[in-house]
Amino acid sequence: MPLMKFKPTSPGRRSAVRVVTPDLHKGAPHAALLDSQSKSGGRNHHGRITVRHVGGGHKQHYRIIDFKRNKEGIPARVERIEYDPNRTAHIALLCYVDGERRYIIAPKGLKAGDQVIAGANAPIKTGNALPLRNIPVGTTVHGIELKPGKGAQIARAAGAAVQLVAREGIYATLRLRSGEMRKVPVECRATIGEVGNDEHNLEKLGKAGAKRRRGVRPTVRGAAMNANDHPHGGGEAKAGQGNPHPVTPWGVPTKGYKTRKNKRTQQFIVRDRRG
């Protein structure tokens, strides 16, 4: 998809870069697959901020996505490719031969009129979903389950892709884009191909207001705060952080410090993403 730049009629337009998407559906989404969602503004049930830089933004309906791909052996036709405000990837509306419609994450190259199917004996073709035990080693996949039947959890964002590099016993080894090598049960399902809208990372919003419409609030530097608000705060004039290692507002080191605590699944990581 080509990139579109604008005439510098304003500072925001001067900096903006957009991805041209002529194949996206221009009408309303499928109403039966919409759900309402309310915004929390990053607050918990006590009203205290638990996630910073969240708040405001445009209202959106949630699109109910079929992450499980459990409608086995029934072919479906891609009715259209749609924009989804809740994720970076586009979504595809499938119409099954029995009349049911479902949304899936749109793989790269999938277009309206294509046919996809899910099942253990599905052909190795973009958009088809099948267990890792039936996918050839070396194949690029996305939308991978971590537990059989739980639904896709890995590689769902725009341009995401994972390579199946080995299969031994009850586990398959995957190479993630981060460089991490991870073992996943071979009964877990994955979708062939990589996620579409892979040029999303080349977009530039151009102005702060575009970020605010997405519900993202400003990030203030710790050094610009008062001493009671941040470890880097305080001091006379433009004082530095006064700390040999930058830290979060709660004193946790921010650069190179490992914060992963889930030892239960550490056994499945063959190689760390840091090499």
Swiss-Prot record:
Coiled-coil intervals, chain numbering: none
The keyword Zinc-finger is assigned to this record: no
Tree of life domain: Bacteria
Keyword Ribonucleoprotein among UniProt keywords: yes
Any one of the GO BP annotations: cytoplasmic translation
GO CC annotations, alphabetized: cytosolic large ribosomal subunit
SMART domains assigned to the protein according to its UniProt record, in alphabetical order: Ribosomal_L2 (SM01383), Ribosomal_L2_C (SM01382)
Region Disordered: start-end pairs: 223-275
GO MF annotation terms: RNA binding; rRNA binding; structural constituent of ribosome; transferase activity
UniProt keyword terms in alphabetical order: Ribonucleoprotein, Ribosomal protein, RNA-binding, rRNA-binding
UniProt xrefs under Pfam families: Ribosomal_L2, Ribosomal_L2_C
Subunit: Part of the 50S ribosomal subunit. Forms a bridge to the 30S subunit in the 70S ribosome.
Function summary: One of the primary rRNA binding proteins. Required for association of the 30S and 50S subunits to form the 70S ribosome, for tRNA binding and peptide bond formation. It has been suggested to have peptidyltransferase activity; this is somewhat controversial. Makes several contacts with the 16S rRNA in the 70S ribosome.
Family stated for the protein in its record: Belongs to the universal ribosomal protein uL2 family.
Protein name: Large ribosomal subunit protein uL2
